[in-house]
Regions:
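Non-catalytic interaction/Regulatory regions outside core domains
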Residues: 2-147
Length: 147
């Protein structure tokens, strides 16, 4: 190291000491598991997360309420499987998610990370059933093996 390099390094020390250091938890915002279809798109999650979409014609639909209760009871099962949940209870808004999946009434849709539809269900599913359908996917099998 020549004299110039040493001086340059010494000059940087005060700046480095003065800059705030963020921990990993402070640097990252907490992940929001459940998102509204008006605030996101399927393309946003391609190859990043698996997507579970819950459609209904109204947030008051008893099937929608039941599905959301089941999801909210065991969020760790979805977080462990790299899932984001998208809800759409406003068919008049014609969200991009609703148009892409052509939903009518209540529908539960699970998509793989590549965006392909894994399941479509006209009734609520419990977390065990959703988890099993995700765990059968080839990419999920690979993730389990690599742990």
């Amino acid at each position: 190291m020549n004299a110039f390099s040493r001086l340059a390094a010494l000059a940087l020390i005060p700046a480095l000491l003065a800059s705030p250091v963020l921990s990993a938890t402070e640097a990252e915002e907490p992940f929001t598991l459940i998102r509204d279809a008006s605030d996101t798109s399927l393309e946003e999650w391609a190859w990043i997360k698996r997507v579970v979409v819950v459609f209904a014609d109204s947030p008051n639909d008893p099937r929608f309420a039941e599905q959301m209760r089941l999801i909210e009871e065991r969020p760790e099962a979805l977080l462990e499987r790299d899932v984001v949940v998208i809800t759409d209870t406003d068919p008049k808004a014609r969200s991009e998610v609703r148009k892409a999946l052509r939903a009518r009434g209540f529908m539960l849709v699970v998509l793989a990370k590549d965006g392909s539809v894994v399941i479509r269900k006209p009734a609520p599913w419990d977390m065990r059933e959703i988890s099993r359908s995700i765990d059968k996917l080839p990419l999920r099998q690979q993730e389990i093996r690599e742990r």
